[in-house]
C-alpha cells in the first residue's frame, strides 16, 4: 500500500508539484470510491487485526469478536456486518489520508489546484483529438515503465494523462483553440443570418428569384422603401380626401368598417354608378349643392376647388373610373368633394 | 415569429386608424391650400404609424422606436419629417456590391429604413426587418382599402 502510494511520486517527482497533487488526488478518489480495494489492501498491508476482523464478520454474523480490534466507533455500529465492513474501510481511508498528509507538503493548495485541473480538463476537451491521443500514448508508456499495480493502472493512467495534458496546455499557447471557437461562433451566426434571410425572402415578393445575399438585401431595401412610400402616398391621398370624409366616417362606425372594407367591391358599385349619373350636372349645379342644409360648411371651399380645378372636372368621367391612385392630390380633392355629395345624396335618398 | 399580418392585427390597426381619422376630421380645415393638405397628410401619416406601432406594442424594437419618435416629434415635427423624406430620397444611390456578401452600405441603408435597429446585430436586425415588412404590408393594404372606399 505504501509502496503504491509512493510509486507515482517516484516517477513524477521531477520538480513539479502537480505530480504530488496527482498522486494524492488519485489515491483519495480510489480509496473513497472502491472499498473493496481497500479491503484487499488491508490484507496486503499485513495488519493482522483488520484481516482477522474481516474473517470474523464474514463467518459469524456477530461482531462481538471484532470489538477487541476495532475502535469504539465500529463498536457502536453493531447492527450489521456490512456497515461494520464499511466502517473499517473508512477507517482505512482515514489512515491513508493521514499518510498522504504527512507525505504532501502542498496539501493546503490542493483544492485550488483541483479546480485548476478541472478547468484545464474542460479546455482540453475542445482540442483536436490527434494531439490528445499522442499525449495519451506517451503517458501510457511512462506509466508502464513505473511499477504501478495492475488493478489500479487504468485509473492511474487516466489521471496521469489529464495532469500531463494540463501541463501541456500550460506550455502551448491556446491559439488553435481560440480560432476554433471563433470560427464556430462565426458559422453559427452565418447560419442564423441565412435562416433570417430565407424568412425575409418569403415575405418580399420577387425576392425568391434573386440569388445571393446582396441582391436579396437590395430587394428587401427596395421593398421597404416602396412600402414606406406607399404609406406616405396613401396618407397623402387620405389627407386630400379628408375634408369630405367626416360624413362617411360618421355614418360608418369604426367597428363595422372592416366589414365594409372586406366587401368593398360590392359596396362601392352603387355610389360609383350614382356618381357617374350625377356627373353631367356637376358644372352647372353649384346652387344645387349649396342648397343642401348639411353641406353648407363645405360649399365655399368646394366652389373654390371647382374654380381652381375646373379643367380637371371636364375629364372626370374617365378619371372616376380609373381610380384615385392615378390622380394627384388636388384633382382627387375636387373629385372627392363631388363624389362626397353624390354619395351623400344616394345615402339619404 | 408571431404572424403580424393576422386578421387580429389587421382589424385592430383598422379600428385604431379609423378612430384617429375621425379625430383628425373633427378639426375642420380653415382653408384648402396645399399647406393645409400637407399638415393633414402629416397628421394622417403619424396616425397610421402610431396605430400600427400601438397594435404591435412594445415587444418589437421598431414599434418602440416609432412610438418614441412620435413622442419626440411633437416639438420638431416639421424639420424631422423634411429630413426623413430627404434622407429616403438621398439614399437612392446604388452601391458597388459583391455577389454573396452583405456590404456595409446595404446594411446601413437597411438600418436607416427600419426604425429602431441602429445598434443591433445583423441577425436581430433581419428579424426586425421581417416583422416590419409584414406590418407595413398590412398597413398599406388597409390604407389602400380605406382610400378606395372613400374615393368612390
Residue ranges and their predicted role:
Chain B
Residues 1-127, 131-152:
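Intrinsically disordered regulatory regions flanking bHLH/HLH domains
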